[in-house]
Amino acid sequence: MNDRQAALDQALKQIEKQFGKGSIMKLGEHSDQNISTISSGSLALDIALGVGGYPRGRIIEVYGPESSGKTTVALHAIAEVQAQGGTAAFIDAEHALDPAYAKNLGVNIDELLLSQPDTGEQALEIAEALVRSGAVDMLVIDSVAALVPRAEIEGEMGDAHVGLQARLMSQALRKLSGVINKSKTIAIFINQIREKVGVMFGNPEITPGGRALKFYSTVRLEVRRAEQLKQGTDVMGNKTKIKVVKNKVAPPFRIAEVDIMYGEGISREGELVDMAAEVDVINKSGSWYSYKEERIGQGRENAKQYLKEHTDIRDEISKRVREEYEIDGSNKEPLDEGEETLSLLDDE
């Protein structure tokens, strides 16, 4: 047994000498066993994710039909990163980002790094350069479907380019996954939905860009509109369901229901009323909502309005709900990792 241990120790020393300190270690000696996270900007989604937010150093895919709220979900995460003093980048391959809407969601557009690349290769090379800097906390690519290979852009209309985009994504993710993990960057890929022709049984819906993103993603979120939210005859927004269809860090298949209001994004008060009532932090009796035996509104909309006007009570309820769901922020790390991440520039 001693000979085996000595041989193992010798092998570990050789590996560390060749590849650097920390290239191999016992898991128990690793200082970062708990997964550090950054809030998604939505209480309901933080709870559905199971760890209180998006895991750092991982790839996230957000997909769904058109106008379902995918970009809104990503922009809320960017606002949360910036609020904690972090740096975020948005690669707008669709050339469709609305700065005014992003600002309404809390994004500091003056500090947001924005790129509107011409080709898929350019977009992914920019993404790699940003991640390798070690100074970007969140990177959003909107969207995978718009990452058009250079050969397709330079070719003629109607030319067949079979599998080009899938190969591009597969190669890019092989290069990106390791450095994303080292740099603790959260990479959010927004994706669209297509339908396979001739599918008789099962779900005909697929996401563009091949299968690589499905494999490399730690978390996959499906965003869908459930119903319209109306005030009289006017449509004010949508009730949206966000389903965690894949999760490597917590149990999957949880669903977060949020109100996405036009021009405002996710209603924090709406999800707070729902989640607080679920764990009896807020009591619901008939149509009345009450907190600490004080009525805060008749009907959900009035309770939402009360919390919007009384931010101190809203924050107090939010803190209690997070404690009930055991996502009180104990796994949050400072976003500024200091000099350590800069060594990524010298990798390879």
Swiss-Prot record:
Keyword terms: ATP-binding, Cytoplasm, DNA damage, DNA recombination, DNA repair, DNA-binding, Nucleotide-binding, SOS response
A molecular-function term among this protein's GO annotations: ATP-dependent DNA damage sensor activity
Protein name: Protein RecA
Upper classification of the organism: Bacteria, Bacillati, Bacillota, Bacilli, Bacillales
Stretches with biased composition (Acidic residues): 336-348
Record function comment: Can catalyze the hydrolysis of ATP in the presence of single-stranded DNA, the ATP-dependent uptake of single-stranded DNA by duplex DNA, and the ATP-dependent hybridization of homologous single-stranded DNAs. It interacts with LexA causing its activation and leading to its autocatalytic cleavage.
Signal peptide start-end: none
SMART domains in the record: AAA
Region called Disordered, residue ranges: 325-348
Database matches in CDD domains: RecA
Subcellular location: Cytoplasm
Principal subcellular localization: cytoplasm
Keyword Isomerase: no
Binding residues for ATP: 64-71
Database matches in InterPro entries: AAA+_ATPase, DNA_recomb/repair_RecA, DNA_recomb/repair_RecA_CS, P-loop_NTPase, RecA-like_C, RecA-like_N, RecA_ATP-bd, RecA_C_sf
UniProt feature, compositional bias: Basic and acidic residues: 325-335
GO biological process: DNA recombination; DNA repair; SOS response
